[in-house]
Amino acid sequence: MTTTKRAFVRDAWSIARTYWTSEEKWSAWGLLLAVVATNLGTVCTSVGINAWNRSFYNALQAFDTEQIFRQLAIFFVLGSLGITLSVFAVYLQQSLQLRWRRWLTQRYIKAWLSNRAYYQLQLTNGVDNPDQRIAEDINQFTNYVLTLSLGLLISLVTLGSFLFILWGLSGPADIPLGQLGLVHIPGYLVWVALIYAGAGTWFTVKIGRPLVQLSLAGQRLEGDFRFSLARFRENAESVASYGGEPVEVGIFQERLQNICQNFRMIMGRQMRLNWLTQGYAQVAVVFPLLVILPRYFSKQIGWGGLMQVASAFSYVYNSLSFVIARYPDIAAWEAATDRLTRFEEQLFELQAPVSAPRQIVIRRRGPAVGINSLDLDLPDGTPLLRGIRFAPLRGEAVLVTGPSGTGKSTLLRAMAGVWPFGRGEISVGEQNSLFVPQRPYLPLGTLTNTLLYPHLDRNGVPAERLKSVLTEVGLDGLVEELDVVENWSQRLSLGEQQRLGFARVLLASPALLFLDEVTSGLDEPWEARLYSLLRSRSWRPTVISVGHRSTLLRLHDQVFDLTRFIPLRDQVVTPLPSPLSTPIALAGSF
C-alpha cells in the first residue's frame, strides 16, 4: 500500500471512529449488525438461486413438467426472501447513515462554532467553503463509507461462497505446452476469473486515479459558484443601485466556466474508464460460457450445469470487479475524506491551546475595564498597533479615533474577544458585554427572536416591552409584526437595521458596549437621540465607540486617539483636528 493510500485509510478511520466509539455506539453497532445480517441473507439466497439454476434448466432439458413447476415454486420462495432481505438491508443502511450523518454534522458544527473558530477561519482563509464541507462532504462520506465497506464485505462473502461452487463445477483443465506435455490445472475457471478480474482492476486504477484530484477540484469550484450566487442574492439591492449586473454576470460566467472546464476533464477521464468497464462487462457476459463450452461439448456437464457455472462465474467476477465497478465512488469518497480531514485539522489548530509567544489574554474578573500593553497584528503577522494602554471609567463613553486603516475596528474586535492576532492583556470585567457591528446580524425568524438575539432564552419578555423599545428607536411601524417570520436583513434598510441593533442593546442592558460605526446609516438627529437613550438608562453602560462623524465627539465623554500607537514606520504625519473633549488618560495598570 502506497503512502498516499495509507494516509487516506488513516484519515477515513480517524473521521469514522468518532461515531463508532461515541455515546451512540451501541445503537450504531446494533444497526450495523442488522445491515450485515440482511446482506448476508441476500448472499445466501443468491447461493440458493445458483443451485436452483442447475435443477431448473436440467428440468427444461428433460421436458420434466412436474419438476419445472416445482422449481418455479422454489424460485418464488427464494425470490420473495431475497426481495424482502434486500429492501430491509437498504432501509436499515439508510437509517444508520442518517443517524451517523446527524451525529457527525452536529460534531463539526460544534467545533466550527466553538471559540469563534468560524470567524478565525474566515480571517485566515484556512479552508474554502466550510458550509459545503459540513452540508455535502459529511453526507457523501457517511454514504460512501457504508456503501463501499458493506459492498466490499458482501463481495468478499459472495466471492468465498461462489469460489467454492465454481471450483467444484469447473473441474480440471489439461493445457498442452508442446514438449512440456499437458499441464493439469484444477478448478481452472477460478484461475481464469482471478486473472480476468485482476487485469481489469489494474487498468481501472491506472486510468481512473486522476479522478480523485478532479473530484476535489470540482467540489471546491461548485462551492465557490454557490457562494457567489448566495452573496449576490444577499446584496441584491446594492448591485441594483450600482447597476452592477454585467459585472456579476461576468463573475458567474467565469466561475461556471471553471466548473465546466474541470467537468470536461472528468468527462474525458470517465470516458476512458467507461470504455474499459463497459467493454469488460460486455465480454464478461459470454466469457464464462466460452471457457466452459469444452466441458459441455464433451458432455461432462449438462445444460443445467452450464447455466449454473455461468451464474457462479458471474458472481465471482462481479465480486472480484468491485473496484472496477465502484471506482468513481471510491474517488469521490477519497475527495470527501480529504476535504473533511483538512477542515478538521484547521479546527483542531484553532481549538488547541495557543503555544505561540504572541497571544491576547482576555481577563473577566474585577469591575475594571482596560488594556495593558496591547499589540495588534494583521492575520499575516504585520504589526498594526503597538503598546496600547488605557482604562476608561465605569459608565463613561469613549470615542476611538485615528486615521482610516489605523485599526480602530480591530481594537474593538480584540476587546470583544473575536480578534486573536496580537499580544497583551485586555480586562473586560465580570459584567456582561455586547459588540454591535455596523450592520447588525439579523437571523431568519420572527421579529421577536431577532430583537432578543442571541438571548432567545429571554422569550418571556412581555410584548408590550418589545413594542415600547421599538417605538423608542423609531421602528413603531413594526410593533404589530413581532410574530412575523421574515428575512429582516433584506426587508429593512441599513438605517432601520441599525435602529433595531440599538433596540437589541436596550433589551439586553449590557454593562460594557462596543459600537462599531453603528450610526452610519442614520441622520444626525436620530444618531444623537439613540446615544442619549443609551446614556440615560439606569444601568448606564460603559461605551466604547468607533465612528468618523464629527458629531460623535459631543456624544462621548472622552476621545482615545490611536495615532500614537501606530508603529513608527507607519505613522501619519498629517495632524488630526483637535478633539472637542479631553483625551483619555493613559493607565499604567488595571
Q: What spans do the regions from the language model cover?
A:
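Primarily ABC-family ATPase nucleotide-binding module
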Residues: G126-V127, E344-L399, G422-G429, S468, ...
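Conserved "ABC signature" C-loop
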Residues: P440-N487
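Membrane-integrated ABC transporters
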Residues: M1-S46, S55-F75, A89-Q93, Y118-L156, ...
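Helix-to-loop junction immediately C-terminal to a conserved catalytic motif
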Residues: A416
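An intracellular "coupling" helix at the cytosolic face of ABC transporter transmembrane type-1 domains
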Residues: I138-T142, L214-E234, A240-F287, D329-A332, ...
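A hydrophobic transmembrane-helix motif
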Residues: A37, G41, T45, N50, ...
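Cytosolic ends of transmembrane helices, especially the final helix of ABC transmembrane type-1 domains
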Residues: G208, V212, G223, A240-G244, ...
